């Protein structure tokens, strides 16, 4: 058993059709143990209003977004397995899946993997960083049996 602890918070008005908690756990366990074997992550599933508010407050972007990552930084000298929080907007993820021709499950998995890598310190601001992060995401997605999430961008 992995040392990955998931705290799943459902803050969506409509919870029907969401991935199961076991799916979120499986996606986290595909990423985290190789980097931080003992880790705790909160995943909060939200509606557009909460996503928009958080995106505006923390990124100065007045629109909802697919996933926001909030890494936890323990005070010096204190070691905790708490990695951070992922805030995922249901409507944005599901709309993107349709627009990008992906299954909802694959896109949900990708958003959890993408957000988890952000919690671990990966970023995609610079081209070389983006290439490294996207390569890791693709490797993890393929290992889980999902298609390359960037295939349409590579064609």
From Swiss-Prot:
Its cofactor is Zn(2+). GO terms for molecular function: metalloendopeptidase activity; RNA endonuclease activity; zinc ion binding. InterPro entries: MetalPrtase_cat_dom_sf_prd, YbeY, YbeY_CS. Its main location: cytoplasm. Single strand-specific metallo-endoribonuclease involved in late-stage 70S ribosome quality control and in maturation of the 3' terminus of the 16S rRNA. Belongs to the endoribonuclease YbeY family. HAMAP family: Endoribonucl_YbeY. This is Endoribonuclease YbeY. The gene is ybeY.
